[in-house]
From Swiss-Prot:
Residues 1-415 form the Helicase ATP-binding domain. GO terms for cellular component: nucleus. [4Fe-4S] cluster binds at C249, C266, C275, C314. It comes from the Eukaryota. This is ATP-dependent DNA helicase CHL1. The keyword Isomerase applies. It catalyses: Couples ATP hydrolysis with the unwinding of duplex DNA at the replication fork by translocating in the 5'-3' direction. This creates two antiparallel DNA single strands (ssDNA). The leading ssDNA polymer is the template for DNA polymerase III holoenzyme which synthesizes a continuous strand; ATP + H2O = ADP + phosphate + H(+).
């Protein structure tokens, strides 16, 4: 009998295999695990059961170790060999009971809170009428007025130690977080002396969306784990969902601000002692109440917001206080990937387990977070706003502020002139070239960055502009995103190390900074934590992670495992439709190829019941094919067989109509989608919604896009600088290009099977899928079921047999 992972159901073999591999990774001391578990195979529960089982066992070992260490340091205890073994054991048991007593009392207390059906009670409580002893007096909340003095720059000292430290710790796009550092570090609530209630080793679970984190919380309620102490009858999981101020703020006015402004507005409000929620959350009794209510049952972010309202405390700051005792913490990507956010929240990854779910897009996410851009239009708007601000406040600004604002305007003038005179799409540029032909010798980027951080001038100008736009009801040119923050972020990027990223011109008169070395950001996470688990439904090709994200991790410290699917072998067939099909750039617009695709889909529609999802490589090609079929007057015939829905860029959501057609019409429907579009990721095409998934061609990205050209040059330079040949460099860029394509293929066709009883066929329509290298980069559960070297007629025949046997 294998290891008991306390799975709430009888796990499938592949779930057991995944849990065993994760558990072995944690026991082995290796640093990184890359795990692929197809959607619908219970990946989340497998992650929970394996990691929490290990965590509880590890805590028990730590507790026993702590007892032994305490015994050795106890002067009343003799470790002499003359002491009978039963005496030693009796003493150990006594110490264990004493240390477990407080844990049991706390568990009993939490059980009482849980049994009291706390949520309805909290909603009815009138906290204002409750008489409780407060160690910190409550402040009467003062509404933030549009007092014009609030828009003046914050006092700062240009050469102060604090400003210098802020600059040195600055990251690529973390200006906002650095502005919060002072107030965040000043947040100091007294902690309990009871060390047993703390949980130094934690599981941090991060995913892309709020809904995915909420789903994790709901799954966490299903299993039941043994306690970490043998004397405990039961031990509930101490779970804490961390979130941003935008999600947790309950201040009436601050919570309504744009996400780019809310962080600084929070700092401003706290500094002026105008947020009673923050003041109350500094109180020991209130912060403990928030923690205990949170730990009494599995709570999501909405529960924390409700709890904050009920207890009249700030959920954001109170959740940070609860962090110390949490065993499992969920948080969005940005919170785990940004060093500055981790620092401000008090997140210490030392010896902890970091799980990054939906990790197939991890590198793209890191690149996106740490990249920025400004357009010529942004610069012009920013200059206009700064002039309005100067005209309004020039008499109230001191000399230093006026000088620094004028320097910022000078910087904008230089950038505007540079874009207007040097723009060439795709051209890489250096920060030095931006200032080479200007009299920028009087500008010091370091000093400007320090000034912007210390004075919060970006927040001041943006919030003043926002207030004026709101007061002018006739103004229709409201800026959707605070412009000064974009400028501020770009100025910060000018001081980044050149090897980490690159500046280049993008279409639309834009200067873009793009991070090129995401491994530099990820390295601190891997080094600090005990172990990092990268999990996803489609992680192939994993070479992308190993070469570009984890080059600093020795191969012996990386574990890889790819699950098969839980469905029977007979529930999925994968066909390579190669006969006469090649959708490369040279031939895909040939009329014969588009006609052949039409014939294939027409016949397929007669043999596949219900829904068929067809993925095209781009919106442009989808539109081109449909127009051709319409001109040939054959499109209508295809739609007579099955109704056709097709995705358009920026178009309305067609999924509800498609779904209702599948439910209402026996003949079913086609859904023409685009790889990388809204329907290619995150949407479940289960059961009749996708009895077949068709991939038209290989969706290689545009090789001549500015971003891809910059990345290509960077990869080539890296290979050559490491001693590689031109041939090696070329090979590396081809590998990079293929990985982007195959990652997109896997994401799209992974929509086909969503649960154990689902069934479908996958059709890879292009003779290039016969290439072994291409097939090797398919997800393993798809690759194992590939049927190649079949004629189209044989594919249709086997399709009919497949659906006849699966009715």
């Amino acid at each position: 009998m294998g290891k008991n992972f306390h799975h709430p159901y009888q796990p499938y073999d592949i779930q057991t295999q995944l849990m065993e591999h994760i558990y072995e990774l944690l026991n082995s001391g290796k640093k990184v695990g890359i795990f692929e578990s197809p959607t619908g195979t219970g990946k989340t529960l497998s992650l929970i059961c394996s990691t929490v089982t290990w965590l509880r066992e590890h805590k028990l070992e730590k507790l026993n170790s702590k007892v032994d260490n305490d015994n050795l340091s106890d002067s009343t205890f003799s470790s002499s060999d003359d002491e009978p073994e039963w005496v030693n054991q009796f003493y150990n048991d006594k110490i264990m009971k004493e240390k477990s007593k407080s844990l049991q009392e706390y568990e009993n207390y939490l059980e009482g809170l849980s049994m009291s059906n706390i949520k309805p009670v909290l909603r009815q409580l009138d906290i204002g009428d409750r008489k409780r002893k407060k160690t910190v007096p409550r402040h009467i909340e003062i509404e933030i007025e549009d007092d014009e003095t609030n828009f003046l720059p914050e006092p700062y000292e240009q050469d102060s130690v604090s400003n210098q430290n802020d600059y040195e710790k600055g990251q690529i796009n973390d200006e906002i977080q650095k502005l919060l550092a002072k107030i965040d570090k000043g947040y100091d609530v007294k902690t309990e002396n009871n060390m047993e209630l703390k949980s130094p080793l934690k599981i941090y679970f991060s995913s892309r969306t709020h809904s995915q984190l909420t789903q994790f919380a709901s799954q966490l309620t299903l299993p039941s784990f043994p306690p970490s102490s043998p004397t405990l009858e039961k031990e509930r999981i101490k779970f804490l969902p961390l979130a941003s101020r935008k999600q947790l703020c309950i201040h009436a006015k601050v919570s309504k601000l744009k996400s780019d402004l809310i962080n600084d507005a929070c700092v401003e409000t706290v500094k002026r002692q105008e947020c009673q929620f923050y003041t109350n959350s500094r109180d020991l009794i209130s912060s403990k109440q928030f923690r205990d209510y949170t730990f009494s049952e599995i709570s999501d972010i909405e529960d924390l917001v409700q709890l904050g309202h009920s207890l009249h405390v700030c959920p954001y700051y109170s959740s940070r206080t609860a962090l110390e005792g949490a065993e499992i913490v969920t948080l969005p990507y940005q919170h785990i990937l940004s060093f500055e956010i981790r620092e401000s929240l008090g997140i210490n990854l030392k010896d902890s387990i970091v799980i990054i779910d939906e990790a197939h897009n991890l590198m793209d996410t890191i690149t996106s977070i740490y990249s920025c851009e400004i357009s010529l239009s942004d610069i012009k708007i920013c200059k206009k706003l700064m002039k309005i601000y100067l005209n309004k406040f020039k008499r109230k600004l001191n000399g230093k502020n006026r000088v620094n604002i004028m320097k910022l305007m000078k910087l904008l003038d230089i950038l505007q002139a540079f874009i207007e005179s040097h723009f060439e799409k795709g051209k890489e540029i250096s920060p030095q070239s931006m200032f080479r032909d200007s009299n920028a010798d009087l500008l010091n980027i370091h000093e400007l960055v320090t000034y912007m951080r210390g004075s919060k001038i970006a927040y001041k100008i943006d919030s003043y502009a926002d207030s004026k736009l709101k007061s002018d009801e006739s103004n229709t040119n409201s800026v959707k995103q605070p412009i000064l923050f974009k400028i501020s972020k770009f100025v910060l990027s000018l001081s980044n190390p050149s090897f980490e990223g690159s500046f280049f011109f993008e279409e639309g008169m834009i200067i873009k900074y793009m991070l090129l070395e995401p491994n530099q950001i990820f390295k601190t996470i891997v080094n600090d934590s005990k172990c990092v688990i990268l999990a996803g439904g489609t992680m192939q090709p994993t070479s992308e992670f190993i070469e570009n994200l984890l080059p600093f991790v020795p191969s012996k410290d990386i574990v890889q495992f790819s699950c098969n699917h839980i469905i029977p072998e007979s529930n999925l067939d994968t066909f390579i439709v190669s006969e006469g099909f090649n959708f490369n750039y040279e031939s895909r617009n040939n009329e014969s190829v588009m006609c052949k695709l039409y014939d294939f889909l027409l016949e397929l529609g007669c043999r596949v019941p219900h829904g068929i999802v067809v993925f095209f490589p781009s919106y442009g090609y989808l539109e081109h094919v449909i127009k051709f079929w319409q001109l040939e007057e054959i499109f209508e015939k295809l739609s007579m067989n099955k109704r056709i829905f097709y995705e358009t860029p920026g178009g309305s959501d067609i999924l509800p109509q498609y779904s209702s057609t599948i439910l209402d019409k026996k003949k079913g429907a086609f859904l023409f989608s685009v790889v990388g579009g809204k329907l290619s990721e995150g949407i479940n095409f289960q059961d009749n919604l996708a009895r077949a998934v068709v991939m038209v061609g290989l969706p290689y990205p545009n090789l001549y896009s500015s971003e891809l050209l910059v990345k290509k040059r960077h990869i080539e330079q890296k290979v050559i600088s490491a001693g590689g040949s031109l041939k090696d460099a070329k090979s590396a860029t081809i590998e990079f290009y293929e990985n982007i394509c195959m990652k997109a293929v896997n994401q799209s066709i992974g929509r086909a099977i969503r649960h154990a009883n689902d069934y479908a066929c996958i059709y890879l329509v292009d003779n290039r899928y016969l290439n072994n290298k291409v097939q090797h980069k398919l997800s393993e559960w798809v690759r194992k079921r590939v049927k190649s070297e079949l004629k189209t007629s044989e594919i249709f025949a086997q399709t009919s047999v497949f659906f006849a046997s699966n009715r």
